[in-house]
From Swiss-Prot:
Its EC number is 3.4.21.92. Belongs to the peptidase S14 family. This is ATP-dependent Clp protease proteolytic subunit. InterPro entries: ClpP (IPR001907), ClpP/crotonase-like_dom_sf (IPR029045), ClpP/TepA (IPR023562), ClpP_His_AS (IPR033135), ClpP_Ser_AS (IPR018215). HAMAP family: ClpP. Keywords: Cytoplasm, Hydrolase, Protease, Serine protease. It comes from Xylella fastidiosa (strain 9a5c). Its main location: cytoplasm. The keyword Hydrolase applies. GO terms for molecular function: ATP-dependent peptidase activity; ATPase binding; serine-type endopeptidase activity. The gene is clpP.
Length: 208
C-alpha cells in the first residue's frame, strides 16, 4: 500500500443529517462546503489541478463570498504553483490565505498572494522564501536554455513577491539569494502576511 493510499484511509468521515436522511462526507469535502480549501504537502501538477478546480467550483457557487485556503506546504514545482497563483488572481471572490505549520518556497508565494488584509499565519508557523531551484544535464546548448529559463522564472517570482509584500525588487532579490526562514511575526513585518492569529477572528468565522 503506497503512502497516498494510506493517507486516504486515515481521512475521517463525517455524517450530516439532511432532509433526505444521513449523508457521509470525507472531512475535506465537508469543509469545502464551508469554502475552506487545504493546500497541504508538495505542490505538483496533480495538486494544482485539484486546487484550481476547487477555486473555480466555489466561484461558480457564489462569486461574492470569500474563499479560505489553509497552507501547510514545503513548496514544489514552480509552474504548478503559478497555475494556482493565476487562478487565485483570476477569480472574483477574495481569497484569504492562512499558514498552518509551514509555507515554504511556492507555498510562501501563494500565502503572500492572498487578498490584501486577509493573509494570516498561526503563531508557530514558519515561512521560507528562496530563489527557484534547478539542476540540469545534457548538451551545453540545452543547459544554457534551461539556465536562461530559470533566471526568467526567478525574475518573475521576485516581481510577484515584491508586488504582494511591498518590498523593493532589490530587497527581494537579495533576501531570496539563499533559504530565508521567517517566524510568523517576522513574516508579518516583511509583508508576507497581514496578521498573526492566536485565535480565529470573528470575521473569519462569518466568512466561512
Amino acid at each position: 500500500m503506497d503512502d497516498v493510499t494510506k493517507a486516504l484511509n486515515l481521512v475521517p468521515m463525517v455524517v450530516e443529517q439532511t432532509s433526505r436522511g444521513e449523508r457521509a462526507y470525507d472531512i475535506y469535502s465537508r469543509l469545502l462546503k464551508e469554502r475552506l480549501i487545504f493546500l497541504v504537502g508538495p505542490i505538483d501538477d496533480y495538486m494544482a489541478n485539484l486546487i484550481v478546480a476547487q477555486l473555480l467550483f466555489l466561484e461558480a457557487e457564489n462569486p461574492e463570498k470569500d474563499i479560505n485556503i489553509y497552507i501547510n506546504s514545503p513548496g514544489g514545482v514552480v509552474t504548478a504553483g503559478m497555475a494556482i497563483y493565476d487562478t487565485m488572481q483570476y477569480i472574483k471572490p477574495a481569497v484569504s490565505t492562512i499558514c498552518v505549520g509551514q509555507a515554504a518556497s511556492m507555498g510562501a508565494l501563494l500565502l503572500a498572494s492572498g487578498a490584501s488584509g486577509k493573509r494570516y499565519a498561526l503563531p508557530n508557523s514558519r515561512v521560507m522564501i528562496h530563489q527557484p531551484l534547478g539542476g540540469f544535464q545534457g548538451q551545453a546548448t540545452d543547459i544554457d536554455i534551461h539556465a536562461r529559463e530559470i533566471l526568467a522564472l526567478r525574475a518573475r517570482l521576485n516581481e510577484i513577491l515584491a508586488k504582494h509584500t511591498g518590498q523593493s525588487l532589490e530587497t527581494i532579490a537579495h533576501d531570496t539569494e539563499r533559504d530565508n526562514f521567517k517566524s510568523a511575526v517576522d513574516a508579518q513585518a516583511y509583508g508576507l502576511v497581514d496578521q498573526v492569529l492566536g485565535q480565529r477572528p470573528e470575521e473569519l468565522i462569518q466568512s466561512s
